[in-house]
UniProtKB/Swiss-Prot annotation:
Protein name (Swiss-Prot/TrEMBL): Membrane-bound lytic murein transglycosylase F
Any one biological process term the GO annotation gives: peptidoglycan metabolic process
Comment field on protein domains: The N-terminal domain does not have lytic activity and probably modulates enzymatic activity. The C-terminal domain is the catalytic active domain.
Organism, as annotated: Chromohalobacter salexigens (strain ATCC BAA-138 / DSM 3043 / CIP 106854 / NCIMB 13768 / 1H11)
Enzyme Commission number(s) of this protein: 4.2.2.n1
NCBIfam families associated with the record: PRK10859.1 (NF008112)
InterPro entries: Lysozyme-like_dom_sf, MltF, Solute-binding_3/MltF_N, Transglyc_AS, Transglycosylase_SLT_dom_1
Gene that specifies this protein: mltF
Family that this chain belongs to: In the N-terminal section; belongs to the bacterial solute-binding protein 3 family.
Keyword Iron-sulfur: no
Mode of membrane association: Peripheral membrane protein
A single GO molecular function term of this UniProt record: peptidoglycan lytic transglycosylase activity
Segments of this protein annotated with the region Non-LT domain: 31-268
Length: 484
């Protein structure tokens, strides 16, 4: 199902050029055409209204992050002004702020809706595909008719709700519950807990969150793809809109927009549900015993403690007495030589092992070429932790031989498996290696790291997982009745 997702998310500007032209009237208003842009340049900041969600904007380890945050930050930089963000509760609040002029721009997973009054829309930024998701305990819905009789949830004001309304025209008996006071992750969690049979969300939103909810499965794509756009006040001129469109066009043409989409939404699904479920269970049962040690090692080495914890899980499933047939031992699975190098005297002591593993990873990272920047530097250090620096250098050489960038993990990871083929390992210094293993190794660590980040962020910002009631007793869902 997700193999086609990036295809759906490719820019779809061509199909909407004519429509967008219709959305921009010839007789603008009595305002100057550049009124909004002039005001922004004069005050030296742009006011953007958004929502605090994993797919739009949130506070990450190093400050604000998120797909739409990255885009509006670039837009502010292109105007040479500061960025002022105002996070509000729902899409309706964003559009109201745009409509009445409190916002210069709205960026909040908005879909193009020509019927929305008082709004001008940018060119399409990416395509968003509505998708039915469902609880694994029910028969899998595979057609729209299978939705009849199910308890379905959707977000009011979103394009996913419009997809259901479009479907209701051909299935008038269809009904569902909708709200504008929750986020997508709330809906997914409610399906996970069996409070709803199904929900309609965007495919990229589910893909970003699916491993955190192992009892939720993707059903089928519902309706046509929709366009993610920015919203601008209709009565403030079009110069700001045109400036945004120029930025979007540049990002499309340069490939930078595709890179951003892949960065935020293009992860491979390399952990199965069973693996995700097991990891979450181990994170609850085992990790608390070692969390303080990971945090201490993080303070000493500068790594995020959750990255070190993810590395430890990949190595031993957080088992302090783990031993491999090759003689590596302990929670971080250190060899005798590595342990001696980093001052570990007892590999089975979890605190020593964690500190030693973090120190060794820092040493490896420090021996990489200075041209390698983050986050590639961390991913390559992890690969070298697994396969050895010599083999990583060999993979970089093969990458260069193939015309790739030896300082980019996306290129080097393609070359690593070639170390298993005589044609390639015979041309490099360190010879044969099981080069596919470090690729899977880094993939798994990144996904474990994502899950730990999600849980940590949930504690502080979103859901407070495990600390709240099992239901949402005060949630104001409204029933959308059948049209019989």
């Amino acid at each position: 199902m997700f193999d086609a997702l990036l295809r759906y998310m490719r820019p779809v500007a061509t199909a909407f050029v004519a429509l967008l032209a219709l959305l921009i009237p010839d007789n603008r208003t009595s305002h100057e055409p550049d009124a909004a842009l002039s005001a922004i340049l004069s005050r030296d900041f742009i006011q953007v209204f958004t929502r605090n969600t994993p797919t739009t904007y949130y506070e990450g380890r190093h400050g604000p992050t998120g797909f739409e945050y990255d885009l509006v930050r670039r837009f502010a930089e292109s105007l040479d002004v500061s960025l002022s963000l105002n996070s509000v509760g729902n899409i309706g609040d964003v559009l109201s702020a745009v409509r009445d002029g409190r916002a210069d721009l709205g960026a909040a997973t908005l879909s193009l809706d020509p019927a929305e009054p008082g709004i001008l829309y940018s060119r399409p930024i990416m395509s968003m595909q509505p998708m039915v998701i469902y609880h694994r305990g029910i028969p899998a819905p595979t057609t729209p008719e299978d939705l009849l009789g199910l308890d379905i949830a959707a977000l009011r004001g979103s394009g996913t709700g419009r997809a259901l309304r479009d479907l209701q025209k051909s299935l008038p008996e269809l009904t569902w519950q909708e709200t504008d006071e929750l986020e997508v992750t709330d809906l997914i969690e409610m399906v996970e807990k069996g409070e709803f049979d199904a929900a309609v969300v965007y495919a990229h939103q589910f893909k970003l969150n699916r491993l955190f909810f192992p009892d939720v499965e993707n059903g089928f794509m519902l309706g046509a793809p929709q366009s993610l756009v920015w919203a601008f006040p209709k009565d403030s001129g079009v110069a700001l809109l045109q400036a945004a469109n120029r930025l979007i066009d540049r990002l499309h043409a340069s490939g930078q927009l595709d890179e951003l989409i892949a960065r935020y939404f293009g992860h491979d699904d390399y952990l199965e549900y069973v693996g995700a479920r097991l990891f979450i269970r181990h994170a609850q049962a085992r990790l608390p015993r070692y969390e303080a040690a990971f945090k201490e090692a993080a303070r000493d080495t500068g790594f995020d403690w959750k990255l070190l914890a993810a590395l430890g899980y990949q190595e031993s499933h957080w088992k302090p007495r783990a031993t491999s047939p090759t003689g590596v031992r302990g929670l971080m699975m250190l060899t005798n030589d590595t342990a001696a190098e980093v001052g570990v005297t007892n590999r089975l002591d979890p605190e020593q092992s964690i500190e030693g593993g973090a120190t060794y990873l820092l040493h490896v990272k420090g021996r990489l070429q200075e041209e390698i920047t983050e986050p590639d530097r961390t991913w390559m250090a992890l690969a070298a932790y697994n396969v050895g620096l010599g083999h990583l250098y060999d993979a970089q050489k093969i990458t260069e031989m193939q015309g790739g960038d030896p300082y980019k993990w996306a290129d080097v990871r393609k070359a690593l498996p070639l170390l298993q083929k005589r044609k390639w390992y015979s041309q490099v210094r360190h010879g044969y290696a099981r080069g596919g293993e470090p690729v899977i190794y880094v993939r798994n660590i990144r996904r474990y790291y994502e899950i730990l980040n999600y849980v940590d962020r949930s504690r502080r910002q979103f859901h407070h997982l495990g600390e709240r009631d099992d239901t949402f007793p005060q949630t104001p869902f409204n029933t959308v009745p059948p049209v019989l």
